[in-house]
Every structure is written in C-alpha cells, then in structure tokens.
Curated annotation (Swiss-Prot):
<keyword id="KW-0027">Amidation</keyword>
<keyword id="KW-0964">Secreted</keyword>
<dbReference type="GO" id="GO:0006952">
    <property type="term" value="P:defense response"/>
</dbReference>
<feature type="modified residue" description="Leucine amide">
    <location>
        <position position="9"/>
    </location>
</feature>
<protein>
    <recommendedName>
        <fullName>Rubellidin-4.2/4.3</fullName>
    </recommendedName>
</protein>
<dbReference type="GO" id="GO:0005576">
    <property type="term" value="C:extracellular region"/>
</dbReference>
<comment type="function">
    <text>Shows neither neuropeptide activity nor antibiotic activity.</text>
</comment>
<keyword id="KW-0878">Amphibian defense peptide</keyword>
Amino acid sequence: AGLLDILGL
C-alpha cells in the first residue's frame, strides 16, 4: 500500500 494506493494499482 502507500504509493500503490495513490496510483490505483
């Protein structure tokens, strides 16, 4: 999670 949540991945 983290940047992946922002990117929607």
